[in-house]
Curated annotation (Swiss-Prot):
It is an enzyme of class 2 (transferase). It comes from Caenorhabditis elegans. Its EC number is 2.3.2.-. GO terms for molecular function: RNA polymerase II-specific DNA-binding transcription factor binding; SUMO ligase activity; transcription coregulator activity; zinc ion binding. Residues 519-530 have a biased composition (Polar residues). Pathway: Protein modification; protein sumoylation. Keywords: DNA damage, DNA repair, Metal-binding, Transferase, Ubl conjugation pathway, Zinc, Zinc-finger. Gene3D superfamilies: PINIT domain, Zinc/RING finger domain, C3HC4 (zinc finger). Functions as an E3-type smo-1 ligase. Mediates smo-1 conjugation to air-2 in vitro and is required for proper chromosome alignment. In the early embryo, specifically suppresses checkpoint activation in response to DNA damage, maybe by promoting mus-101 sumoylation. In embryos, plays a role in determining telomere localization in the nucleus. Acts with pie-1 to promote piRNA-mediated silencing and fertility in the adult germline. The keyword Membrane does not apply. This is E3 SUMO-protein ligase gei-17.
Length: 780
């Protein structure tokens, strides 16, 4: 598109300079369909659908001498959008026979006049109609003398009434008497309805104001208004008070070169602060005292230079038939406009009802929370002095005018928004509480979602009403960094409140260790005299500490497993016995004079005979698995507890000698145990946990056999002899050997308690103390 100043250069297109300027101005005023008709008639190149592209094609064609004259004539003949229109030649079908055939903007008014005229023709005689024809002829001649013959004006109701009265003055003398009568007297049947229709038509055709009444928009802290590009224009209400209508309006505005240079950036990557173009809507239905906040019309839709503006999303609601509402915030239209163009247009479409709205465009400078924080913190007038707040504290705690005094007033030093320690305590001037909040946190929260509500009392807390309290600012500088709460006094001073926190340990120490916060022990009380600490130190440890431990049992089991592998190693018996003797069952700790803690070991497992079990041969270990009928594991455990170390050593020596004698008369490596073949009143039975059908077991098992036994031996009983295969030993010889052992060392248990037992899994023998009844069973 060529600007106007370039048409001052002489162009050789066959038109004068004035004609070129007139043609250019006429083209710029044409509508899109008029431009399209010129392009189609002259067969010009087809432009893009934008109006600016159509204008560009037509203006460029003015340089062509073949099209310049035609474009000038066609553009000049098109209407320019004003209230004047070109008069077309009337045809015979358009000639009216009554005197009220004047064009009107409203088709309803013409129809109403025609209707009244038809009824008048039916009631009045024909000569009266001739009189009206004469009046019509004289009226047309009078209009042709006053107005330009090529145009007529659109009539308003006032002009229509004036012309009707004038037509009567130019008529017959009989009609002159009607000039003093009211207008509706000519229509006796429908005079009232005609007057009401004219009043409605006058009201609907009355020109409406473009700009809204003066009001004060709500100032936005994060937007500094530089200039007003479009003064708030009025979005009119619906013509019918009960019906809603969809309306559209377009408003032009201009940008200067300075504005264009400041917004020539990419809005998505440019950080704050930056310049923006802002579109705002307001509700002007009811007069509101104070600034007007942003409010969007119903079903609002906006476009800037044919680009759709993204409005804030509708707030979701669960209420039925609720009117959709949008958040109260401005709209950034910087990215919706051509930044290198001066003339712009805003088009707004909305659903009009009885409410009145307004829309305006502003050029603003957008800032962030850090800039607002510096502005308020550096402004001395926005700081409340220490003495003013101190007097307010004294007034609240002493009762003041209300005679209601508080016992104490605790103030938290933590920000109610972030739950962290405040750095710049601030509050609203209109709030009555003394509790403050952090200024920077409050500004950052409202930058993301502008609500401007006090975090303490939820009342309105705008930016221009915020203050910085120097009383609490001085308090934060003096108290410890770990302090989170203070108590205000009646004289305006304060005490630091520190919480008592102690850690209860499960150790045997009597000392109470205070809990630490960030490496510093907090053990002071509310009054600072330290009474709580002294009481905590003098508090005796009366609680019983119970220790549940299985470490000793694990060591015993480990010793037993080692003894199974070394049961026939004579050199290791002594070392195993010494090791097992050192590992005694856990005993109760002795109480000292300073120790009042009683240690209880909740271990219902009976202690085991460590020394005996650690050095018994494999077959003697298997003998312990035999239990008499009617016995229980608990009885077995108590019997083992009764065995002392001397008895265990005697039994071990006796069994070793029997094994050596059996080994001398046999080539087998496993010993044979000799027993009396006599009937004993005590019979033995197999333990329930011994499987008679099981074969040879691994040496690592508690009930296993020595590695020297490769196969399970088979025992036989013949004539008082017991042995494996043909290796038989007299029972009498075994009895003599047992008597010799009794004479050498004190014997607690008689060898007669070793009963004969034939087992299919290797011929193992079991030993039981004399207090248990023994029963002997022969296995099948």
């Amino acid at each position: 598109m060529l600007p106007n100043n370039q048409w001052q250069i002489p162009i050789n297109n066959g038109l004068t300079h004035q004609e070129n300027m007139a043609a250019h101005a006429a083209v710029m005023k044409l509508r899109v369909h008029d431009l399209q008709s010129i392009i189609s008639q002259l067969s010009l190149r087809k432009p893009r659908p934008q109006k600016s592209e159509h204008q560009k094609v037509v203006v460029e064609s003015l340089r062509d001498p073949h099209h310049a004259r035609q474009i000038y004539q066609m553009a000049s003949n098109f209407p320019n959008g004003n209230y004047e229109m070109q008069k077309r030649p009337a045809t015979t079908s358009q000639v009216r026979s009554h005197p009220y055939v004047l064009p009107s903007r409203s088709g309803a008014s013409n129809h109403l006049v025609n209707h009244h005229y038809q009824q008048q023709q039916q009631q009045q005689p024909q000569p009266h109609n001739l009189l009206h024809q004469q009046m019509m002829a004289s009226h047309h001649s009078h209009l042709q003398q006053q107005h330009h013959p090529s145009t007529v004006r659109w009539l308003t109701p006032e002009l229509l009434e004036e012309q009707l009265r004038g037509s009567m003055r130019y008529g017959a003398p009989a009609a002159a008497a009607a000039t003093n009568a009211p207008l509706h007297s000519s229509f006796p049947n429908h005079g009232r309805s005609s007057q009401q229709s004219l009043q409605k038509s006058e009201k609907s055709n009355r020109p409406k104001k473009m700009y809204a009444d003066n009001f004060e928009p709500l100032p936005l802290p994060f937007y500094d208004v530089i200039s007003v590009l479009l003064k708030p224009v009025e979005l009119h209400s619906s013509d019918s008070p009960t019906l809603k209508q969809t309306k559209q309006l377009q408003f032009p505005f201009l940008l200067t070169a300075e504005h264009i240079s400041k917004i020539s950036y990419r809005a998505d990557v440019t950080p704050l602060p930056r310049y923006e173009l802002q579109l705002r809507f307001f509700n002007l239905t009811e007069p509101v005292q104070g600034p007007q906040k942003d409010d969007f019309p119903l079903n609002c839709y906006a476009r800037v230079d044919d680009s759709v503006v993204q409005l804030p999303n509708v707030i979701p609601t669960n209420k039925t038939n609720a009117e959709p509402k949008r958040p109260s915030r401005p709209v950034n239209i910087t990215s919706n406009m051509n930044r290198y163009k001066k003339e712009h247009t805003v088009a707004v479409e909305w659903l009009a009802d009885k409410r009145v709205w307004a829309a305006g465009v502003y050029f603003v400078h957008r800032v962030n929370s850090d800039i607002l924080f510096k502005r308020l913190n550096q402004n001395v007038s926005r700081h409340r002095s220490l003495e003013v707040t101190k007097q307010e504290v004294i007034k609240k705690l002493s009762g003041g005018e209300d005679d209601i005094a508080m016992d104490r007033l605790n103030i938290s030093l933590l920000d109610p928004l972030c739950k962290t320690r405040m750095t710049t305590p601030s509050r609203c001037q209109d709030c009555t509480h003394l509790q403050c909040f952090d200024l920077l946190s409050y500004l950052m929260m409202n930058e993301k979602k502008p609500t401007w509500q006090c975090p303490v009392c939820s009342s309105n807390c705008p930016y221009d009403r915020l203050i910085v309290d120097d009383y609490f600012l001085d308090m934060l500088a003096k108290v410890d960094k770990n302090t989170t709460e203070v108590e205000l006094k009646e004289d305006g001073s304060y005490d630091v409140i520190k919480e008592e926190a102690f850690c209860i340990s499960d150790d045997d120490d009597d000392d109470v260790v205070p809990a630490t916060v960030n490496g510093t022990a907090s053990c002071s009380s509310t009054n600072g005299n330290g009474l709580a600490n002294e009481a905590a130190k003098k508090k005796p440890a009366d609680d019983d500490i119970i220790t549940l431990s299985d470490d000793d049992d694990e060591e015993l089991n480990r010793g037993i497993m080692n003894s199974l592998n070394d049961s026939f190693s004579p050199g290791r018996h002594t070392a195993s016995a010494e090791l097992a003797a050192q590992k005694t069952p856990p005993q109760q700790k002795k109480k000292t004079k300073d120790d009042d803690i009683e240690i209880i070991t909740l271990d219902d497992t009976p202690p085991r005979p460590v020394a005996a079990s650690a050095n018994l041969p494999m077959r003697q270990m298997s003998q312990q698995n035999q239990m008499p009928v009617g016995s229980s594991p608990s009885g077995m455990a108590s019997t083992q507890m009764g065995m002392n170390e001397g008895a265990s050593k005697t039994i071990r020596d006796a069994l070793n000698k029997i094994g050596e004698q059996s080994a001398n008369s046999s080539t087998q490596s496993s010993p044979l145990v000799q027993l009396h073949h006599t009937t004993h009143p005590l019979n033995f039975a197999q333990s329930s946990y011994m499987n008679p059908s099981s074969g040879s077991q691994t040496p690592t098992s508690q009930y296993g056999y020595s590695p020297m036994i490769n196969q399970a031996p088979h025992f036989q009983m013949q004539n008082g002899l017991i042995g494996r295969n043909n290796q038989m030993v007299h029972m009498q010889q075994h009895h003599l050997q047992q008597q010799q052992q009794q004479q050498q060392s004190p014997q607690i248990m008689s060898p007669s308690f070793y009963a004969q037992q034939q087992m299919s899994n290797g011929g193992a023998f079991a030993y039981y103390p004399p207090q248990y009844p023994q029963q002997q069973y022969r296995q099948n």
